[in-house]
């Protein structure tokens, strides 16, 4: 029955296909139209076709009404024809019954009248040539062909349901319904076959397939023609203008209100970033007093301090009533009890927790331990736990110095400060921790050669002493080298000997970092060389040493530590160079 109904709807299917292609330029497969015509409700057909045409105005509405009229007429004809076919079948069955009765009567000899049998509907075709054989096979295949059902959840079914409009139209299928063209490299939009190759419908940059990209990279006449063809609609596509779309009034108002909220939120975030006010607070339950034993981040001193304070507070909270404070007022004849006996308990608890959370507990302990010692004076590092150096006089007045040192804390301030002064510059110069700084060429070679005396950075470093210099992997251009050499000829003089080559990606040598100054301090203390750097912080470098053999190395940002084996080899290379010099 389904096959007969599909065959009966073929003229209507053909009419729908032609109307959609000619009037609306829609390439819709026959399976979709047959599915629409198989719907039994006229309202469902009207709703489906309206969604397919994206509206029911003008010609679209007229087409929908014509389609429903033809569909109803077609169904009525189909019902009447099927009814007539049923009647014919009943007549045929009655005729067959009469023939059977005649045969039975003829067997009995009562009625000798012969009734002709029904002629065979199909006559065998005589096959004489290969063409006749092919025609016979086609007729057999057409008779045996059955209706094939396609699963809509497979790839084939999805392809048949997808509608591809002619031209480039915005589509939000994300490459699920249509074939994927590519992703926009600027905004990241997923462009499908419906949007097509060309300017991105959001940002306007070119989006094309991999095959088209290969053609464009050839830089030939064909690639220029293809580029011109793809970018032909760049003026009209570009960014999608919301005002050009057909929006309903409530959609337009909702979009405007959303835009206003987004602008207000942007201004709020910019204001927060401008003021940099702390508006959030992290509450860590592990740093609470009651979790002191389980907090793994506390040091041993902090844990002991908390346990001691916990015992004190427990005794204070569960103290005997005999130790309760009572005030007797003889003049007023009153006895006053302590109104809030746990006030001291809560105050001590809060002080301890706040000291641990802020990290000032260790500092308070250090200050308590230091309070009983002698004043520190002008030590470079006041937290150094070692005896202060003593002055050794080689002129023969050592006993007098010793007696003055044994005089106790009643010494003169100048003598006491002189005693506590630490001269650590030689120690820092002699100590090599293997710290390295990565620099671009040709500045790295000029610093190791001693032509460049300072190095500018946007960050401060507390490092002092030997600093290794490594060249990055970027090779300098001849123009950069010539410009930098001309600059340093003006600053240092014409007799400067520049290096012959500027190797990259290797360890060049080392310098001694004397100080790190701000730009203002640098201009005040070194006005002669203030033109060499205008950075926020300036490294003052002295004693440059270049390696004979440059080790290949990969740099890191800021100041980083060398590998121990490379560090030992670099120090040996410097020693060999010093001996050779």
UniProtKB/Swiss-Prot annotation:
<dbReference type="Pfam" id="PF23134">
    <property type="entry name" value="TRIP4_3rd"/>
</dbReference>
<keyword id="KW-0963">Cytoplasm</keyword>
<dbReference type="GO" id="GO:0016604">
    <property type="term" value="C:nuclear body"/>
</dbReference>
<feature type="region of interest" description="Mediates interaction with UFL1">
    <location>
        <begin position="300"/>
        <end position="400"/>
    </location>
</feature>
<dbReference type="GO" id="GO:0180022">
    <property type="term" value="C:RQC-trigger complex"/>
</dbReference>
<dbReference type="GO" id="GO:0032790">
    <property type="term" value="P:ribosome disassembly"/>
</dbReference>
<dbReference type="GO" id="GO:0035035">
    <property type="term" value="F:histone acetyltransferase binding"/>
</dbReference>
<keyword id="KW-0832">Ubl conjugation</keyword>
<dbReference type="GO" id="GO:0016922">
    <property type="term" value="F:nuclear receptor binding"/>
</dbReference>
<feature type="domain" description="ASCH">
    <location>
        <begin position="437"/>
        <end position="531"/>
    </location>
</feature>
<dbReference type="InterPro" id="IPR039128">
    <property type="entry name" value="TRIP4-like"/>
</dbReference>
<keyword id="KW-0479">Metal-binding</keyword>
<keyword id="KW-1017">Isopeptide bond</keyword>
<dbReference type="InterPro" id="IPR056993">
    <property type="entry name" value="TRIP4_3rd_dom"/>
</dbReference>
<keyword id="KW-0539">Nucleus</keyword>
<dbReference type="GO" id="GO:0002020">
    <property type="term" value="F:protease binding"/>
</dbReference>
<feature type="cross-link" description="Glycyl lysine isopeptide (Lys-Gly) (interchain with G-Cter in UFM1)">
    <location>
        <position position="334"/>
    </location>
</feature>
<dbReference type="GO" id="GO:0005829">
    <property type="term" value="C:cytosol"/>
</dbReference>
<protein>
    <recommendedName>
        <fullName>Activating signal cointegrator 1</fullName>
    </recommendedName>
</protein>
<dbReference type="GO" id="GO:0005813">
    <property type="term" value="C:centrosome"/>
</dbReference>
<keyword id="KW-0007">Acetylation</keyword>
<dbReference type="InterPro" id="IPR056994">
    <property type="entry name" value="TRI4_N"/>
</dbReference>
<dbReference type="InterPro" id="IPR009349">
    <property type="entry name" value="TRIP4/RQT4_C2HC5_Znf"/>
</dbReference>
<keyword id="KW-0206">Cytoskeleton</keyword>
<dbReference type="InterPro" id="IPR015947">
    <property type="entry name" value="PUA-like_sf"/>
</dbReference>
<keyword id="KW-0804">Transcription</keyword>
<dbReference type="GO" id="GO:0072344">
    <property type="term" value="P:rescue of stalled ribosome"/>
</dbReference>
<keyword id="KW-0805">Transcription regulation</keyword>
<keyword id="KW-0597">Phosphoprotein</keyword>
<feature type="region of interest" description="Disordered">
    <location>
        <begin position="390"/>
        <end position="410"/>
    </location>
</feature>
<dbReference type="GO" id="GO:1990116">
    <property type="term" value="P:ribosome-associated ubiquitin-dependent protein catabolic process"/>
</dbReference>
<dbReference type="GO" id="GO:0019901">
    <property type="term" value="F:protein kinase binding"/>
</dbReference>
<feature type="modified residue" description="N-acetylalanine">
    <location>
        <position position="2"/>
    </location>
</feature>
<feature type="zinc finger region" description="C4-type">
    <location>
        <begin position="167"/>
        <end position="219"/>
    </location>
</feature>
<dbReference type="Pfam" id="PF04266">
    <property type="entry name" value="ASCH"/>
</dbReference>
<dbReference type="GO" id="GO:0008270">
    <property type="term" value="F:zinc ion binding"/>
</dbReference>
<dbReference type="GO" id="GO:0030331">
    <property type="term" value="F:nuclear estrogen receptor binding"/>
</dbReference>
<feature type="modified residue" description="Phosphotyrosine">
    <location>
        <position position="289"/>
    </location>
</feature>
<dbReference type="GO" id="GO:0030520">
    <property type="term" value="P:estrogen receptor signaling pathway"/>
</dbReference>
<keyword id="KW-0863">Zinc-finger</keyword>
<dbReference type="GO" id="GO:0044389">
    <property type="term" value="F:ubiquitin-like protein ligase binding"/>
</dbReference>
<feature type="region of interest" description="Disordered">
    <location>
        <begin position="100"/>
        <end position="121"/>
    </location>
</feature>
């Amino acid at each position: 029955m389904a096959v007969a109904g599909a065959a009966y709807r073929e003229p209507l299917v053909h009419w729908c296909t032609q109307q959609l292609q000619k009037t609306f330029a829609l390439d819709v497969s026959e399976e979709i139209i047959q599915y629409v015509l198989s719907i039994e409700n006229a309202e469902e057909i009207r709703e489906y076709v309206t969604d397919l045409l994206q509206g029911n105005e003008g010609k679209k509405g007229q087409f929908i009404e014509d389609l429903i009229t033809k569909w109803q007429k077609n169904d009525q004809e189909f019902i009447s024809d099927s009814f007539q076919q049923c009647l014919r079948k009943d007549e045929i069955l009655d005729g067959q019954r009469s023939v059977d009765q005649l045969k039975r009567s003829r067997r009995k000899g009562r009625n000798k009248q012969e009734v002709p049998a029904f002629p065979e509907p199909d006559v065998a075709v005589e096959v004489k040539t290969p063409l006749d054989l092919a025609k016979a096979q086609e007729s057999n295949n057409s008779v045996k062909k059955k209706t094939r059902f396609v699963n809509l959840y497979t790839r084939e079914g999805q392809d048949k349901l997808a509608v591809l409009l002619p031209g480039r139209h915005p589509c939000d299928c994300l490459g699920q319904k249509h074939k994927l063209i590519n992703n926009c490299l600027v905004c990241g939009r997923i462009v499908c076959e419906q949007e097509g190759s060309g300017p991105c419908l959001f940002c306007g940059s070119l989006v094309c397939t991999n095959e088209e990209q290969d053609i464009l990279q050839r830089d030939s006449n064909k690639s220029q023609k293809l580029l011109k063809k793809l970018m032909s609609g760049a003026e009209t596509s570009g960014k999608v203008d919301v005002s050009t779309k057909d929006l309903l009034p409530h959609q337009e108002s909702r979009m405007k209100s959303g835009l206003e909220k987004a602008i207000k939120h942007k201004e709020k975030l910019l204001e927060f970033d401008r003021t940099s006010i702390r508006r959030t607070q992290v509450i860590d339950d592990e740093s609470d007093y009651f979790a002191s034993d389980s907090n793994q981040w506390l040091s041993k001193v902090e844990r002991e301090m908390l346990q001691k304070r916990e015992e004190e507070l427990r005794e204070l909270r569960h103290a005997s009533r005999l130790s309760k404070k009572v005030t007797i007022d003889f003049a007023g004849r009153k006895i006053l009890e302590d109104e809030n006996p746990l006030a001291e308990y809560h105050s001590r608890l809060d002080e301890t927790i706040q000291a641990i959370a802020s990290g000032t507990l260790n500092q308070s302990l250090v200050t308590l331990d230091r309070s009983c010692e002698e004043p520190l004076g002008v030590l470079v590092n006041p937290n150094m736990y070692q005896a202060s150096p003593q002055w050794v006089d080689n002129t023969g007045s050592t006993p007098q110095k010793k007696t003055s040192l044994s005089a106790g804390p009643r010494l003169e301030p100048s003598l006491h400060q002189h005693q506590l002064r630490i001269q650590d510059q030689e120690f820092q110069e002699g100590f090599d921790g293997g710290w390295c700084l990565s620099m671009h060429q040709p500045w790295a070679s000029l610093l190791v050669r001693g032509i460049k005396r300072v190095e500018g950075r946007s960050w401060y470093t507390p490092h002092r002493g030997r600093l290794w210099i490594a060249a990055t992997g970027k090779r300098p251009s001849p123009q950069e080298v010539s410009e930098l050499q001309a600059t340093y000829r003006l600053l240092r003089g014409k007799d400067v000997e520049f290096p012959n080559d500027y190797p990259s990606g290797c360890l060049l040598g080392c310098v001694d970092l004397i100080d790190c100054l701000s730009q203002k301090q640098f201009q005040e203390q070194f006005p002669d060389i203030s033109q060499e750097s205008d950075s926020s912080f300036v490294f003052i470098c002295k004693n440059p040493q270049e390696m004979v053999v440059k080790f290949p190395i990969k740099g890191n940002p800021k100041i980083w530590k060398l590998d121990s084996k490379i560090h030992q080899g670099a120090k040996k290379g410097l020693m060999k160079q010093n001996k050779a010099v």
